Amino acid sequence: MLSRFKCSRLQLQKRAISVTKATTTTASQPKRRRTTTFSDALNKGPSFEDFVSGKAAKFTLDPLQQARSNIEEAKRLPRWLKVPIPKGTNYHKLKKDVRELKLSTVCEEAKCPNISECWGGGDSSKATATIMLLGDTCTRGCRFCSVKTNRAPSKPDPAEPENTAEAISRWGLGYVVLTTVDRDDLADGGAHHLAETVCRIKQKAPKTLVETLSGDFRGDLEMVKVMAQSGLDVYAHNLETVKDLTPHVRDRRATYEQSLSVLNQAKKTVPTLITKTSLMLGLGETDEQVLQTLQDLRAIGCDVVTFGQYMRPTKRHMKVVEYVKPEKFDYWRDKALELGFLYCASGPLVRSSYKAGEAFIENVLRKRANN
């Protein structure tokens, strides 16, 4: 009995020594996270013991995370795209008049970065506003645009043409831009409403030059003729982007060829009419695609083109692929003039109705009128 007890005691001692050795060995080696199927890269990171001991700081950042950080750094807003907060006497006056007359402006609806410069005006330059007609709700949903959308917007305000003309006469502008939301719910796309507004402005302020920035009227060229013959001075319709990106950027009802046909018809209807379009850069377009677009525009006699940086209005809209440097915008301006465009405004903050372009076009139109 005694020998059995000694034997059992000896076995227990051996087991205790074995467990102690195993514990000592395990404690000397920090535990690593067990392999998972989530990502091999994650398993190469520091363990909990590394964080406790302070060794985690020696680990290099996961390459995937490093790549994401680099992308985010590149996406930060460059200094040349930062603008001041809107202010000034003219700015507040225009804003007050717009509210009183129940008008909408694309400057506000589209969150234009130039609103401070255009509305602010100054001693040597008159304030400029782009008035948006046919309401503030569009029937289309382009991926770059922040204007509200609805399949059935409210009916056009019959007093809008008169109110718009009254506002223009109050401001004493030498040049005004009228734009519209797309109204596919209307039989004529709103062409007659816009044409009437142009006529009222010419009656109340005959010296004011009028530019209209309108949609494609679903490709109805008869409505393009109505607009071209309304008495306006500049017919603007935006291509927005190059041909290959159009299906991904614009509403499916807007096509590259359809937009070219609108500009072409306007020029054919009134050959002396200045035609104008605008392109956004930073959407992933190539130089070859931009050059081809310029050549397509010159082939139909388009007179003016503007280039501006695409700015993502909200996180719900398409992302910016690239922030194009100012030097590249200078390159495209020179290229456009080389191809024969009458004028080209090109810069990160330039928009289709940018006032620097309007001042130039105003001078061209007045010289034509005097000759």
Curated annotation (Swiss-Prot):
Q: Which InterPro entries match?
A: Aldolase_TIM, Elp3/MiaA/NifB-like_rSAM, LIAS_N, Lipoyl_synth, rSAM
- The name of this protein is Lipoyl synthase, mitochondrial
What's noted on cofactor binding? Answer: Binds 2 [4Fe-4S] clusters per subunit. One cluster is coordinated with 3 cysteines and an exchangeable S-adenosyl-L-methionine.
User: Which Gene Ontology terms cover its molecular function?
Assistant: 4 iron, 4 sulfur cluster binding; lipoate synthase activity; metal ion binding
| Family matches, as HAMAP family | Lipoyl_synth
Where are the annotated segments for Disordered?
A: 20-42
Q: What broad class of enzyme is this?
A: transferase
- Which organism is this entry from? Lachancea thermotolerans (strain ATCC 56472 / CBS 6340 / NRRL Y-8284)
Which cofactor names does the annotation list? Answer: [4Fe-4S] cluster
Q: Which family does it belong to?
A: Belongs to the radical SAM superfamily. Lipoyl synthase family.
| CDD domains, per the entry | Radical_SAM (cd01335)
